[in-house]
Structure formats: C-alpha cells, structure tokens
Amino acid sequence: MREVAVGLLGAGTVGSGVWELLKKNGALIKNKSGIDLRVLKVADKDQKIKKTLGIADEVFTQDPMEVLNNPDIDIVVELIGGTTVAKELILSAAGKKKHIVTANKALLAQYGGEIFDRVLQEEVEIGFEASVGGGIPIIKTIREALVGNRITKIIGILNGTSNFILTKMTREGIDFDRALEQAQALGFAETDPNLDISGGDARHKIAILSSFAFNTVIDHDSVYMEGIDGIDIKDIAYAEEFGFVTKLLAVAQLFDHGILVKVHPTLVNKENPLAAVLWEDNAVMVESDFLGTSMYYGKGAGARPTASAVVADITDIAGRILSRSEYNSKRYAFFSDLQQIAFEKSRTRYYFRFNVLDRPGILSKIAGVLGDNRISIASVIQKEKEEKFEHVPLVMMTHDAVEEDVRKAMKTIDSFPEVEGESRIIRVLVD
C-alpha cells in the first residue's frame, strides 16, 4: 500500500492537535480505512514547537516553502490562520498540484470564490470541514448525505464562545461583562473576543455553509451581523417569562425570490431542540424537502474536535488519491445565481423592551405607532415601578413584522419624551 504524504503548515492549537491525532491514531486510521498517512513535513515559525511535540529534525522546518516544494507531499494542510499569507500558500499549493485541507473560515468566507476557481483550474481537491462546525461533519453531510435533498433553511449555533456566555448569563443570572470574564478565564474566549461576540466568526461560517447548501456564492460582507454584547440580563429574564431562551443564531433561508442570510441574537422557544444546546457546544439544524428537519450537534471548537475534522478531510482526499478516481469538478462549482435578500426586507416576530414613564396613555401611544407601521402586538408585560427609578420596563412580543417597518417605528417611539434611551429589539425564531 502506498503511503499518502502530508505536509502541515502551522503547528499551533489545531496543527498540534492534528499532529498528535495522527501520531496516536495513525494505525487505527490505517486499519479502518486502509490508508497509511505519513506527515513528511511540519512548518512553523516557532522553533520550540519541535521539542514540545517531539517532531524529528528532518520533519520540522520554519520555511513553509519546504512543504510546498517537496515533490513527495500529496496533501498540504494549512493551519496558520489569517487571510494574507494563508491565501498565498493555498494558491501556490494548488498551482503545484498539491491537494489542500484548511480550517481557515475567514479565508474561505472572504476569498472562497478565488480559491475554488484555482482548485478547479488545477484539478486538485480541497477539504474545509473544520472551517464551519469544528468537529461537526456538517459540510460532508450537506454535500453527501443530503445530496438528494433541496435544502430550504439552515439555522446554526456556530460560535461556542457566544453560546457559553449566553448560557452563563441565563443559568447564573450574571451580566455580560462578568460572563465574558469567566469565559476568558476558562479558555473559552480569546483575550480579544471581538470576532466571537460581534457575530463575525458565525458570519464567516454561515457564509461558507450556505454557499454549499444553496450552490451559490454568498458575499459574507452583505450578511447582516449583530453580536451579543448588547444583550442585557433583563432581556434574558423577560424572554424566559415568555418561554424563550436567548441564542446567537446564524440563519440562511431560501425563498422564491432569493436567499436571506443573517447572524443576530435570537429568542428560541424552549421546546425547540436548539434551546438545549448549552455552553461551548455548537449545533446546525437543516430543513430539506425529503428528509425534513435534521440536527447535527457537537463540539464546535478546540484542538481535538477541529483536528478530528481536519484528519477526516485528509483521509477522504487520501482515499480519492489512492483510488485514482476521476476528478469531480461539481464538488467546487456553484451553479445557482441566487440573489441575496436585503435584511431590511426580512420578516419575523420581535421582542421589544421600552423604558417608559409610568403614565396613563403611554402603552396606547406606543401601540398606535406600531399599528401605523403594520406591527401587531401578541403579548405585553409591564413591570411595577421601583421607588428609585422613574421609568418602568414595558416588554412586548409581536406577530410577524417586516424589519424596515420595525426600524421606522422604533425611531419614532424612541423620540417620545416618555421613553428613556434606546429601546431594545431582539428577533424571534419563528418555528
């Protein structure tokens, strides 16, 4: 049996996980798949990694071009991150007829079109399972298990940091800042957590996922994004009174006139399976015409889950190399030209919280503005006034409404002298 030679670019958190997995379970992979994987080169700028991971002198290098220029290497695994050097290395690897595996979500979200064009041109394979759901095999599921289905909707909890923070706030009644501090202390949030809490990480992932689910190129910059840093513990508590849990959801939905892709905090009914996805776990719910609703759940980040997905891609590509199967260009070609629907035109239910003076007529005044903008109230909670506060919270749930109508109404309501500050809007998942 011929070995399939692998070159690693980057031996950080994920790269070291891949090295350790192949070292520990290489024989298991060979016995289960008949594929003998050998890491021929590991490139990393940190010389100390060699000793830490026990990498032999002849295998380790600080020059990534030693990996790309090695004629014996079949598969190049890019795990250095970033979008500049990583892009150059991937394009160069494709040009040298190397197959590619990457976990780089930011790179694929921004430059996926260019990278897939090059892959098609050079007739090489690219695996990117780890770029979306960490250890959840959602790309493979969509491309293979659901190949006979027309997918109509994807709803994902795609960022473990945000889910951990929201779970902390919900379960322990602590505010956002304290929950973030605890997430950082436990290693579930970066020192600079902005990409996670802003929704940026989830936006990268849903752009990649929806591109392959709907066979169209999704411009990630046009995906509406709102993070969790504006979520108040009060809103989590009030939402629970209505029977909802707060989650950061990434949603892609197919309509007759196009596709809507968005990321924002969302209230999820407690009976929905997504409400039970806690702490750092991720989940993806897929709606399709023949299978119906299916859900995929697991660890979305971390060295081991991500390494598991990377090695699955390596093994998959290695199998195609050894079988000498005909190159399938359809794996990386997008055949639909769907229009992305503007977020302002989207329709859903809403949660509103106003801080209002406790005066007669304010509820009817607000309801009048909502009615003028075609927004129907489903239920209301008005809390008792506390002695030290002049204003009281007025909380509402609506029926379906259009985003641009909601924004117009809120602008008017927030201008009322009886309303303090900017009112809070959270969208609701319509089951």
Q: PLM features: residue spans?
A:
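N-terminal glycine-/serine-/threonine-rich beta1-alpha1-beta2 phosphate-ribose binding loop
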Residues: M1-K96
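Rossmann-fold NAD(P)-binding glycine/threonine-rich loop
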Residues: A86-G95, K105-G134, I139-R143
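A short hydrophobic/small-residue beta-strand
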Residues: H99-V101, I377
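Rossmann-like NAD(P)H-binding beta-loop-alpha module
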Residues: L120-D201, I208
